[in-house]
Structures are given as C-alpha cells and as structure tokens.
Amino acid sequence: MASSLKKLISSFLLVLYSTTIIVASSESRCRRFKSIISFGDSIADTGNYLHLSDVNHLPQSAFLPYGESFFHPPSGRASNGRLIIDFIAEFLGLPYVPPYFGSQNVSFEQGINFAVYGATALDRAFLLGKGIESDFTNVSLSVQLDTFKQILPNLCASSTRDCKEMLGDSLILMGEIGGNDYNYPFFEGKSINEIKELVPLIVKAISSAIVDLIDLGGKTFLVPGGFPTGCSAAYLTLFQTVAEKDQDPLTGCYPLLNEFGEHHNEQLKTELKRLQKFYPHVNIIYADYHNSLYRFYQEPAKYGFKNKPLAACCGVGGKYNFTIGKECGYEGVNYCQNPSEYVNWDGYHLTEAAYQKMTEGILNGPYATPAFDWSCLGSGTVDT
C-alpha cells in the first residue's frame, strides 16, 4: 500500500513538474530589464556602420534627410528618426542603445548594440562561395557575437553584476537579421528557388547565436521575423513588370515575395519553439514584424498613413518614388515634408512613424509570441 502511494505521489509530482515546464515555456515572465543587447542589421543599427565607414565614403545615413525628424545631426540610423530598438528603450526607461563600433567614452552598462547596416546572418565567405556578393560589410552575425564575447569580461568588470547576471537582466534583441542574406541574391538576379535553399541555414545561424547567448547567461530574447518585402518600394521596382501582373488587389504588394518571407518566418518560429522546449527557463519571444507592418498596407488610413503606403518618402522617379542607384541621400533626391504620413522612408527602410506603431503592436500585442508581461512595471501600455 505504501509502495503504491509513493508511486502515485511520484507520478503526480512528475505531471505537476511537466505542467510547470509547459507553462513556463509558453508564457513570458515579467522582468525589469536593466539593459538591451542588440545584434542585427540596418533595422537595428544605431550608428555602427557609420563609424565603421571610411570618412571619405560615408553612407547616405550620415547625411540629411536621414534623422531629420529626431536626431540632429544624423546618427547613422536608416530612417528619418527613431527605430524599433529606440522605442523599446524608451518604453523600458533606458537610454538609447549606443553602437559599440567607434564609440568612445561611452558607458555600455545599460545597453550595447552590434547591429550593422548590411549585415548578414551567414558569413560573407560562405555567401561568396554561393556566388552571392555582400559588399556592404563583413560584420555578420557570427562576427558580432564573437566581438561581444571578446569584450564581455570588460563589460562585466565595469558593472556591479557578474556576467551571467548582466545577461540575465538584459533584453537581447536578435535582429532583424537574415533579410540581407536574401536581399543580395534577389538583387543579383538569383531565382527564388536558389534563394530558398538559404532559409534553413539562416535559421540555424540565428538559433546557434541564441544558444551561445543562453550559455553565457541570456534569459530573455526578442527574435524578429522578416518584413513583407513584397510591399517594399525597392522590391516592387525591381520586380515591377511581374509584380503588376500579380499584385494583391487590396494592397498592391507582390504576393510571391511575401509568401517567401512567410516561409522564412514559419521556419524561424518552428526553430524557436524547439529551442523554447529545450530551454524552459528562458523566454524566447517571436516578434512578428511581417504582420505588424502588413496591416499598414491593408488599412493605411486607420493607422494615420494618408499617402500611398507603398511609395518612398525620400526618393525619386517611378511609380514608387524609388530609383535603384539614385536613392535617398544622393544629390538631387528630395524627401516628403510629411514623413509621419508615410510607411516607407527610402525604399528599403521605414519611417519613424511606422516603426513606432510596429513597436506598439509588438510590446502590447498581438504581434509578440508569447506576449510580453509588463505587470511588474506598473504600466500595461507603450507610451512613446
């Protein structure tokens, strides 16, 4: 009898433990983040590419009208103002996350950013082996992560917390990253089937980086999916002949490219679910950049975008105010006087207004899975 009772209790405790694990892996736990650690590309770059560039060949983001709505002078952000990472920092009550590269006499205790304009998830040498040129930068995700690992002892030494505690108290933003791995071959004329072969490799690179950071002590990850590139002025211009024959009647976007993007996102979500089950003590939150943005193209007026949502605010020529080789920042290229009414900034990137509304949808739902729990902050809404 006693033996049977012990077995019954053991079985009950096992079920209870298993249930706890499932709940922990499917719900976001509230944390008071003390810093933001960021990796990625131009969607999160707060100045790294600017500082890495030759002073005689500065990027367009070094000049007006970039930053004209908020940062003076331009900070190297690929927008007219703030990015998603900036609005997240504001919400958390943290300073804007400084770029690591080129920064001098800057404290990284409350945040550090390794994201670089043009960066890829896969290494440059690997892409070159596939016949894909990536000329912007060689600071891929693995290079960013290696740099972080190299300086981590110094970061911890300047903090009152040890390394694992510092990472555990941080919101780790993993991108967006991977978009350029697709951008380069698309603009080089590779077929969609060729490019699709990269998807599992890119997802694996993102997953491996997350695992490395978990091993270092990371506990909360915000992992964005890709954008609906079939609504991008740059892509709509590149594929204009075929896109106009097969465009979505509601949005004017090119469905084939959006379906490709969703294929990447589904693969990424599947991998994140696998990681979450394997690391139940960690919060891995998927940020649905695709749908958070796509709603603006579906109902632009509802979100305050009065002008054509597909056209670039800063650009020149063509149906989408975009010409390859004569982009925003070049001489003779004008920009709109009301960027807050535009979704698209320069053909590739978004306006501050679009990024702000995307951030609201991610931090307050429904575009984060699992949803953030902000109950411990005493505020349940994004106030930016």
UniProtKB/Swiss-Prot annotation:
Glycosylation sites: 105, 138, 321
InterPro entries: GDSL, SGNH_hydro_sf, SGNH_plant_lipase-like
Localization, UniProt: Secreted
Single Gene Ontology MF annotation: hydrolase activity, acting on ester bonds
One CC-aspect GO term: extracellular region
Domain of life from the UniProt record: Eukaryota
Keywords: Glycoprotein, Hydrolase, Lipid degradation, Lipid metabolism, Secreted, Signal
Signal peptide: 1-24
Enzyme's top EC category: hydrolase
Family of the protein in this entry: Belongs to the 'GDSL' lipolytic enzyme family.
Protein name from the UniProt record: GDSL esterase/lipase At1g28670
Organism of origin: Arabidopsis thaliana (Mouse-ear cress)
